């Protein structure tokens, strides 16, 4: 058992792990028993993401007790819309590990390191994007995006997406050094060296942290959870759907906003 007081880095995914859209809150209780909610993100003048007030209090407490690092696939602009409770995190990781933010400012040295690793091992983004676009069908393709000039994703109509399409794309992408995964309505194509875990390890090195606690719900979080000494995943999401686990990862039964609360309780107990 690791003694309390050991320098610890708490690295957590955000969307559908700590913060939730209205559709993802999964409020199954009677309306009169529903938790009070705190809006933590507004987009185009509309509330978009929430935490329960209980989770907000727990996060504020955690941020004062340990080095808390938000870790997200969001771009820097998308991350900038989020207003988490408690002290502002000194460090944040955006673009699936492509950007380190230090006091809100991106670290150009880290970006250069990431770019060099990708260039050495992967086909160019433009090539992968072109092949992805050519393989997609306008009947189910809703949007096509490139994030931070690092990776690409498609927003699709899941009901019309053909069975086996993602698997077929993943096979040719693998030979180009890219990984493809379906997460909700999005199909991500991400260069294999672009990982959340690499960025978290770099922050652990910089901060002198001897232990990492982590949480996440999606396939892009798997490497982050594997890099942690202890980790948790909620009862929803792609990892839960696949029954994914690892020795240091605890699969929680809670889903939606209740899972966000429970993850924060586990973090606090672990620091």
Where in the sequence are the language-model features?
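Mg2+-dependent phosphoryl-transfer enzymes with acidic/Ser/Thr/Gly-rich catalytic loops
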Residues: 26, 190, 197-271
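Proline-centered loop/turn at the N-terminus of a beta-strand
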Residues: 9, 67-68, 91, 179, ...
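Short glycine-/acidic-enriched loop or helix-start segments at secondary-structure transitions
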Residues: 21-22, 79-82, 103-104, 223-224, ...
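A general structural motif
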Residues: 5-7, 65, 89, 149, ...
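Conserved acidic, metal-coordinating active-site core of Asp-based
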Residues: 129-213, 218-227
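Glycine-rich, phosphate-binding/catalytic loops in enzymes
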Residues: 26-30, 86-88, 231
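Active-site phosphate-binding/coordination module
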Residues: 49-133
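Active-site neighborhood of HAD-like aspartate-dependent phosphohydrolases
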Residues: 2-70, 80
């Amino acid at each position: 058992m690791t003694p309390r007081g050991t320098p610890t880095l708490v690295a957590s995914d955000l969307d559908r792990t700590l913060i939730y859209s209205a559709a993802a809150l999964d409020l199954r209780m009677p309306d009169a028993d529903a938790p009070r909610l705190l809006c933590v993100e507004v987009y185009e003048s509309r509330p978009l993401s929430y935490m329960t007030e209980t989770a907000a209090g727990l996060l504020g407490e955690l941020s004062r007790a340990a080095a808390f690092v938000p870790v997200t696939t969001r771009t820097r602009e998308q991350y900038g819309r989020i207003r988490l409770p408690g002290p502002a995190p000194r460090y944040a990781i955006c673009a699936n590990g492509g950007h380190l933010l230090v006091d809100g400012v991106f670290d150009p040295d880290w970006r250069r390191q990431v770019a060099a690793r990708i260039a050495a091992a992967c086909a160019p983004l433009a090539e992968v994007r072109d092949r992805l676009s050519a393989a997609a069908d306008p009947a189910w393709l809703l949007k096509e995006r490139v994030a931070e000039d690092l990776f690409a994703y498609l927003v699709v109509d899941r009901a019309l997406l053909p069975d086996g399409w993602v698997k077929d794309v993943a096979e040719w992408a693998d030979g180009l050094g890219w990984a493809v995964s379906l997460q909700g309505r999005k199909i991500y194509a991400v260069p294999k060296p672009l990982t959340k875990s690499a960025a978290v390890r770099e922050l652990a090195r910089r901060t002198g942290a001897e232990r990492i606690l982590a949480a996440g719900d999606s396939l892009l979080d798997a490497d982050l959870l594997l890099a942690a000494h202890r980790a948790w995943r909620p009862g929803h999401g792609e990892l839960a759907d696949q029954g994914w686990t690892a020795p240091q990862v605890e699969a929680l039964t809670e889903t939606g906003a209740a899972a966000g609360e429970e993850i924060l309780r586990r973090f606090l107990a672990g620091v």
